[in-house]
């Protein structure tokens, strides 16, 4: 954790432990294990609202997908003093961006017209996936996206789990949903609910079971906001 940047959500680290985060307006904060501290680099116009997602693709290679639909490649030079950032901007979408996620080498994003796209970083291939308007009108905004069996599963805030490749079998809930996490060792997708514990989704059997909050060894009455 970074105590000097409380409640920071825009943070990414590469395999060497180099870390970039966005918390302060007009700055990108950079950490290197060699120095053991953060340096704040001025980047005009940068803030938490502009940066829809921040992620690392390789050592000392970071990307920001911004609200204007531009992909910013950021390569920090930790050997220079003061620290310098090489920033290259590439427009990849013509509409404003609502939200974005990065999963296993692929950038997923929803624009302000509720169109859902993927952008494969390896070969810079953009693909239209779906129009989410009808789902968002009924179930609210996206809470999270997860890959399960290499397929994007979309979690909607007001109670919907949607397999983007099989929308006819969308699973509705009578409770709000906050988060989702694929199990690394079992064929299970964990879904955190608003006050009804954690649900387990078995894709093989196309069914759910659950763990209620009262069954946990600790007293917990709040919604499940995240799963690790």
Where would I find each of the regions flagged by the language model?
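Carboxylate-rich, polar loop motifs that coordinate divalent cations or form catalytic acidic clusters
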Residues: 1-228
């Amino acid at each position: 954790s970074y105590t000097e940047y409380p409640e920071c959500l825009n943070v990414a680290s590469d395999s060497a432990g180099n870390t970039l985060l966005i918390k302060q307006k007009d700055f990108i904060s950079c950490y290197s294990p060699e120095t053991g501290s953060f340096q704040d680099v001025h980047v005009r116009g940068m803030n938490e609202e502009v940066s829809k997602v921040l992620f690392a693709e390789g050592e000392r290679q970071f990307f920001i997908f911004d609200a204007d639909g531009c992909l910013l490649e950021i390569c920090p030079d930790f050997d220079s003093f003061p620290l310098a950032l090489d920033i290259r901007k590439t427009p990849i979408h013509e509409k404003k961006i609502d939200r974005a996620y990065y999963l296993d080498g692929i950038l997923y994003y929803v624009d302000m017209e509720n169109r859902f796209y993927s952008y494969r970083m390896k070969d810079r291939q953009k693909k239209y996936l779906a129009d989410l308007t009808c789902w968002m009108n009924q179930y609210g905004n996206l809470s999270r996206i997860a890959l399960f069996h290499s397929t994007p599963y979309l979690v909607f805030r007001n109670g919907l789990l949607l397999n983007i490749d099989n929308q006819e079998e969308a699973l509705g809930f009578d409770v709000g949903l906050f988060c989702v996490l694929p199990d690394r060792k079992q064929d299970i997708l964990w879904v955190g609910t608003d006050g009804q514990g954690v649900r387990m989704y078995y894709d093989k059997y196309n069914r759910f079971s659950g763990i209620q909050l009262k069954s946990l060894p600790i007293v917990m009455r709040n919604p499940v906001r995240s799963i690790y």
